[in-house]
Amino acid sequence: MTLDEAVISRHTVKAFDPAQRVPQEKIDTLLNVLHNSPSSVNSQPWHFVVASSEEGRAAMAKSATSNFIYNKPKIADASHVIALCMRSDLDEAHLQKVLAQEEKDGRFVADGAKAGQDKGRRSYVDLHRYEQRDLPQWMEKQVYLALGGLLLSAAMLGIDATPMEGFDARELDLALGLREKGLTSVVLVSLGMRSEQDFNAALPKSRLPRDEIFTFI
């Protein structure tokens, strides 16, 4: 499948076939995409919880309550569900861990590169923590960068996907024990193969005209 074909053909699946499983090698490819997702100053303020078992999906489905009950089948019937989570803070331990990994991976060749990277990253963290006071929103933006790559990659692999903000984040955090780990859930993505009940598959894609959303200068 070409990139153009993937962009046009992908859609948010409304019903999954519970009998269909995504092959593990394709899941591994998607995990590699998430692992290598870009983030501002390589901050990597995320964690991904992958539910592949019936028990795991059931735990995540607990968050589809009340106004979000319509999303429960999309979680329970999927092959895999990934909870994209963010850190509650970019603390000293995390910043040191990222810096140490960069050094281990050979990122610092020039003299002073390590100190420069550390200083630059901290300046952005401090900017969002103190001046702009939007550190959680900034971290959340990085998670959505990962989401975009995941959805496009799934389409390229012929995997159907459903991104969901319609869930109770508090319930999911409790079900997965996220908060005691310094994490909170941001968005869910169900992966699998659509069923015949997926009405969205037969509907045309609808976007505003190109001349309304692009400006060339």
Named regions from a protein language model:
Residues 1-217:
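Acidic, surface-exposed loops and disordered segments
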